[in-house]
Structure formats: structure tokens, C-alpha cells
Design a protein with these regions (language model features):
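Hydrophobic face of alpha-helices
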Residues: 64-65, 122
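Post-HEXXH active-site segment of zinc metalloproteases
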Residues: 114-127
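Contiguous mid-protein beta-loop-alpha structural module that forms a pocket-lining wall or clamp
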Residues: 116, 129-164
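A general structural signal for well-ordered alpha-helical packing
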Residues: 122, 152, 168-171
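Divalent metal-dependent phosphate-bond-processing catalytic cores, especially two-metal-ion Mg2+/Mn2+ enzymes
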Residues: 1-29, 52-55, 59, 66-93, ...
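Active-site alpha-helix of zinc metalloproteases
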Residues: 98-102
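Hydrophobic alpha-helical transmembrane segments of integral membrane proteins
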Residues: 60-61, 95, 151
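Short alpha-helical hairpin
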Residues: 25-48
Length: 271
């Protein structure tokens, strides 16, 4: 059974997309797909209970999808053509489909393990992507193939260990890095410190636990502004060691402002 948080995120996700579009229909199919739900749930079990990492399950992937599609829409509203549009091979909605698929499926590989999970995610996701795209009316084989390939680019590139080249794929790793609010760290932090000493890697959980809120909206000088609200300085670790490396590897970097706020202090501009 889905959690209230998952259902809330699904409603937010559907509101971002235009009703009647392929991307909206695809989102409806994604959130209702039993196979995807089962893989996401089990992957979260592996991540939190077996490996001691933070949330990599259905809540995380829905939040990343919201983050990515929010940034996609901001670029579109600013008149920035996505790679498929610029190359005159696809539409904005094709890009939205690819971004949606990549973000919603990017961590399926955590159901196997952490090492090379982005590659495992692509392997697991490919037949699912094909099945879902074949169910959309009005998409010919050429467009389905194009969307599939771009979605896979976003999945394999989300760890910032492989060079990616499209704006669409570049949004996935930034969107992933933006999901660092304290709620994502609370469960594994409680498990890891339940009567035990803190161990190597807990800095990620402590730093994420100091992130109060991440806001993505229209920038002042660039189309996208990411504002990270923190309760303490330790949250800077999450920004500097997780988010910024992903932004630096993203083709979408030129369009992003990054600002941090610690308590009531003035803004810290990273980008």
C-alpha cells in the first residue's frame, strides 16, 4: 500500500504536466504500475535496511521527478529549447517524457545493490520503458526509440560519473542532488544510531538532517534558482560534496543559480 507521502507527491507530479499530453498520460501509467512500485519498494528496503543508506525508494523517485520536471518547465518558460527541440528531432513533450522516465526510474538498480546501481537501473528500466511507451497512442517507433535512449542517458548519468550531453539528462542528476531534505535522512539515521556509535558515512545523514527545505523556482539572472534552507553549517557538506559536483557535470549548469541560507543569515551564492 502506498504511503500518504507517495500519494501527495503523485498529485503534485500530475499537476506539473499538461493534461492530454503524452507526458501526463505516461505519469498516470507510471504511478499505477505494479512492477515499478514493487521494485522501488524492495530497492528502498535494500538501501535502508541492508546497506544503511538513505531513502532510494518510491518517495525519493517521485520527488526527483517533481524536481526535474519543475526545472524542465522553468527552462521552457524562459524560452530555452531542450536538446530534442534544438536538434529538431523532437518536441518539448518528448523531452518531458524522457525526463519523467529517467527521474522516476533512476534508482531501480538499488534493488540489486549500490555499486554501479545506475547501470543496473538502466538494465532494469529498459524493458519497462519500452512497455510503457508502446502503450501511448500517437507515438511512432522513431519517437519511442528517441525517448527511450534519452531516458537511459539520464539514468546512467545521474551519479555524475559519466559524461552526458543533453539538457534533458542534465536535469536528472541535479534533481537527484536536490532531494536532500532532512526527512530523507531521518529513518536511516535513527537506524544507524540506535544504540550504536556513528560510523563512516554518517556525515551524509547528519548533513542531510540539517537541510530544512530545498526550493526550485525562477531565478533572478538565470532560468532556475535552487535555494537550500539549512538549520546549521553542516548542511554545507551536502551542498558542496553532493549537489555541486552533480551540477558541475550537468549540461544544464549554465542555467542554474544555487543559493544557501543558514538560519537567518544572508544568502550564500554558490552559483
Amino acid at each position: 500500500m502506498k504511503s500518504p507521502k507517495e500519494l501527495t507527491l503523485e498529485r503534485r507530479l500530475l499537476r506539473i504536466l499538461e493534461e492530454g499530453s503524452h507526458s501526463h498520460a505516461l505519469a498516470q501509467t507510471l504511478v499505477a504500475d505494479e512492477e515499478i512500485q514493487n521494485i522501488q519498494d524492495y530497492g528502498n528496503n535494500v538501501s535502508i535496511k541492508r546497506l544503511g543508506f538513505n531513502d532510494h525508494g518510491p518517495v525519493h523517485m517521485r520527488q526527483v521527478a517533481i524536481n526535474a520536471l519543475t526545472m524542465l518547465r522553468l527552462l521552457h518558460q524562459a524560452g530555452i529549447p531542450m536538446s530534442l527541440e534544438k536538434e529538431q528531432v523532437g518536441t518539448y513533450d518528448d523531452s518531458a517524457c524522457a525526463v519523467l522516465l529517467a527521474s522516476f526510474l533512476h534508482d531501480l538498480g538499488m534493488s540489486i545493490g549500490r555499486q554501479d546501481h545506475e547501470l543496473m537501473s538502466a538494465i532494469i528500466a529498459r524493458p519497462i520503458i519500452r512497455r510503457l511507451l508502446e502503450g501511448l497512442e500517437g507515438l511512432d517507433a522513431r519517437r519511442r526509440t528517441m525517448i527511450e535512449c534519452m531516458a537511459l542517458e539520464g539514468i546512467v548519468g545521474h551519479m555524475a560519473t559519466r559524461r552526458i550531453h543533453s539538457l534533458e539528462a542534465g536535469l536528472i542528476l541535479i534533481a537527484d542532488g536536490c532531494d536532500m531534505e532532512k526527512g530523507r535522512a531521518r529513518i536511516p539515521l535513527a537506524i544507524s544510531l540506535g544504540g550504536q556509535e556513528a560510523h563512516y558515512g554518517d556525515i551524509h545523514k547528519y548533513s542531510a538532517n540539517s537541510i530544512e527545505h530545498v526550493r526550485i523556482d525562477k531565478g533572478q539572472t538565470k532560468p532556475i534558482r535552487i535555494t537550500v534552507h539549512m538549520s546549521s553549517e553542516v548542511g554545507c557538506f551536502q551542498i558542496e560534496e553532493v549537489l555541486i559536483p552533480k551540477i558541475n557535470m550537468s549540461p544544464s549548469k549554465p542555467f542554474v543559480e544555487l543559493v544557501a541560507l543558514v538560519g537567518g543569515e544572508s544568502e550564500r551564492h554558490y552559483l
